């Protein structure tokens, strides 16, 4: 390339200077935490990490872990929550959405906004395969998604917040929610009306592939909208040796399975995430009999509510069309009453920025990371639709569970474990997010 002449060099200098002026007003990606915020985070983390406090947290988590309860069956867990709130001196409403508890801490320093902090309480229908002293004592039930830790962290936050009650300007609501696992407990909590006055809401979820002391999230769309479906194809049963005298629903189901895969590969923008997974197939139970009916079921997900609605429409159309082509009838059920579809979890930019700043002040900027979008569904989305919300992952891994020789056991695994040193971190972060929000939005 030939060297530029003098005129060209002058133009380059002018352009560079203009760029400096143009972008000088833009904020940098990180800002130093105020001394007051940093001190708040340090104080709360030190209090939660003190031997007596941390031991109390571990004891709570182990008691909950040993007695897991499924969706809307969290009777014993709810009793434990209420007993601890009574001991701390925090009033509450119960029952909420059957087994839930909503506690309220009214600040003694004046009026202000209402901040909600949320933890889910239910376990999963899994047999725990981790051999340890505090293993689940309930056959076929396990806290394999860390909800025992979530409840513990929020109880820890309750204790921290109650100790500072007289300094708070505003109200903090602590939501101990039932039935996150597929049953949309958040929706039912909102139906109670107890959160109608909430200004903002914050939630945490454990994640085993991040170490203790690290949190992660992202602004905007974070977790997918998710729904389930089931379909039954009805034909005409008969002898497998004379299929022409029957109407085979197994062929119709098979055709539908293949056609449904094209929803992602041929109808979805490759730059937009979507999933259609068939996870259940049922037909006959004899080798020489064409069954009268066959069925399929599965899940579908999208990073947008609009995308989920499109998938729902097309799933019905494809199933009914494939049934018709194969001379069968089809009934499609999206299980909207039993397993209500979850909206996409979308973090409010302002609330995400607030929680991120608090976490950076407490844990250090290097320990607050940008998370990848997740195709997991989360009913925190219902809250975030109603009030500006922020949902963060909190690390529960360590050198043993994340080391080179270790296979990270994901949530929903019967081998899932967590490092209890994360419990004080979660308790302190919950409390700090709420306190700092009230401090920044003082109504006086």
UniProtKB/Swiss-Prot annotation:
<protein>
    <recommendedName>
        <fullName>IAA-amino acid hydrolase ILR1-like 8</fullName>
        <ecNumber>3.5.1.-</ecNumber>
    </recommendedName>
</protein>
<comment type="similarity">
    <text>Belongs to the peptidase M20 family.</text>
</comment>
<dbReference type="InterPro" id="IPR002933">
    <property type="entry name" value="Peptidase_M20"/>
</dbReference>
<keyword id="KW-0732">Signal</keyword>
<comment type="function">
    <text>Hydrolyzes certain amino acid conjugates of the plant growth regulator indole-3-acetic acid (IAA).</text>
</comment>
<dbReference type="GO" id="GO:0010179">
    <property type="term" value="F:IAA-Ala conjugate hydrolase activity"/>
</dbReference>
<dbReference type="Pfam" id="PF07687">
    <property type="entry name" value="M20_dimer"/>
</dbReference>
<dbReference type="InterPro" id="IPR017439">
    <property type="entry name" value="Amidohydrolase"/>
</dbReference>
<feature type="signal peptide">
    <location>
        <begin position="1"/>
        <end position="32"/>
    </location>
</feature>
<dbReference type="InterPro" id="IPR044757">
    <property type="entry name" value="ILR1-like_Hyd"/>
</dbReference>
<dbReference type="GO" id="GO:0009850">
    <property type="term" value="P:auxin metabolic process"/>
</dbReference>
<dbReference type="Pfam" id="PF01546">
    <property type="entry name" value="Peptidase_M20"/>
</dbReference>
<dbReference type="InterPro" id="IPR011650">
    <property type="entry name" value="Peptidase_M20_dimer"/>
</dbReference>
<keyword id="KW-0378">Hydrolase</keyword>
<dbReference type="InterPro" id="IPR036264">
    <property type="entry name" value="Bact_exopeptidase_dim_dom"/>
</dbReference>
